[in-house]
Amino acid sequence: AAIFDLDGTLLDSMHVWSDIDVEFLRKRNILKVPKAYSQALASLSFRETAEFTIDYFSLDEQPDDIMHEWNQMAIEAYSHHVQLKPHAKEFLQFLRSKNIRLGVCTALSQKLYVPALQNHGIFDWFDAIVSTDDVNKGKSYPEPYQLTAVRLGVSPEDCVVFEDIPEAVTGA
């Protein structure tokens, strides 16, 4: 089986989150996104990111409110603007032609990954899709990948994982 990350691996979407960071922080009169902040987010779940953001910037806000705001900004981008990485669709077609089971393991919420994959006509190509929200752990931990393997009906040892973040590779 093959398990794919979405942001930065199948989807050319990393700019979406940096754009959201800039706009979100600008609304709070924080005019520069610190590099250390951006780097710390790489393998966190969506909720962990909201909690980290509150702590990092000492915001008097609730994680659910922040996640809702981010979701509204991101739904627009993922539904209409995010493109597949070059040759991603062809590679997935090739794997499907070899009867290789396909899975997704992503930090994206269902509200974002469904429209992104549907927009490119590949949502139904995946035999299993797991979000870090399903296990409440980021991708630096093995649990998201283990659940993806279970849902694919294969042992983790029989999976190849495609990731772009070193911490996530460690988790896999």
Per-segment meaning from a language model:
Residues 1-98, 111:
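N-terminal helical cap/lid subdomain that shapes the substrate entry/recognition surface
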Residues 4, 162-163:
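Active-site flanking residues adjacent to catalytic metal/cofactor-binding acidic residues
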Residues 8, 171-172:
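Residue preferences within the helical output face of two-component receiver
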Residues 10, 84, 102-105, 137, ...:
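Conserved SAM-binding loop
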Residues 35-36, 64, 105, 127, ...:
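Residue-level detector of family-conserved "landmark" positions at structurally sensitive sites
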Residues 81, 109-160, 166-170:
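Substrate-recognition "cap/lid" segment bordering the active-site pocket of phosphatases
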Residues 96-103, 145:
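Short, conserved structural micro-motifs that define repeat-unit consensus positions
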